[in-house]
Curated annotation (Swiss-Prot):
Pfam families recorded: LplA-B_cat
Family stated for the protein in its record: Belongs to the LipB family.
Record-listed E.C. numbers: 2.3.1.181
Reaction catalysis annotation: octanoyl-[ACP] + L-lysyl-[protein] = N(6)-octanoyl-L-lysyl-[protein] + holo-[ACP] + H(+)
Designated name of the protein: Octanoyltransferase
Site residues, Lowers pKa of active site Cys: 136
Residue ranges of domain BPL/LPL catalytic in the record: 33-208
Localization terms from the record: Cytoplasm
Further remarks about this protein from its record: In the reaction, the free carboxyl group of octanoic acid is attached via an amide linkage to the epsilon-amino group of a specific lysine residue of lipoyl domains of lipoate-dependent enzymes.
Stretches assigned to coiled coil: none
Species this chain originates from: Pseudoalteromonas atlantica (strain T6c / ATCC BAA-1087)
A GO CC term attached to the entry: cytoplasm
Amino acid sequence: MNDTTPVIIRQLGRQAYFPIWQAMQDFTDSRDSSSQDEIWLVEHDPVFTQGQAGKEEHLLAPGDIPVVKVDRGGQVTYHGPGQQMMYVLLNLKRHGLGVRTLVSALESCIVDTLKEYKVDAYPKADAPGVYVDNKKVCSIGLRIRRGCSFHGLALNVNMDLAPFQRINPCGYAGLEMVDCTQLGGPDSLAVAGPAIAEKLCSLLGIASVENKEGFDE
């Protein structure tokens, strides 16, 4: 990366899904070539999100958990407490990135983080995300608009995985989910969030970051 402008890493705490999705869209629509890139670390209240390719039959029994149809790639997944979301709001041209390269970097930042805990995680060529023993620990879904990315990844850290049984996760019937705590990996968002953000920046050649709490007033 040739640009020396710091990437902002924003710690947003626990938030409802819809306002953060709206903020991502507003940020992407209003940014220009001089806007700083940002990475958002956030934890969501329980919600199912249905991607652009989503099919209703994969929503088995959502019950009292709301379903939001969103503009990312992929099928249905679940977000909730104890899961680390990392949203990547990047100007792809600035970083010399193609979409596939960004997806690979997102997968690698999880694989590399878990490797430090002696957990053997891996991506799958035909099903984006990160897996351990055929169980999924991280889901990935992106949207590119005007050459800029938004959405990102969801890493199961220390959470109630039961809501995943109400759907076919990512469109795969019977796909088992797992979290980092079960694997002996990082057991809190306070540890996992900064670790994966640091790994991603390293993989993308981002040398300068600026850490912030919450949104600017």
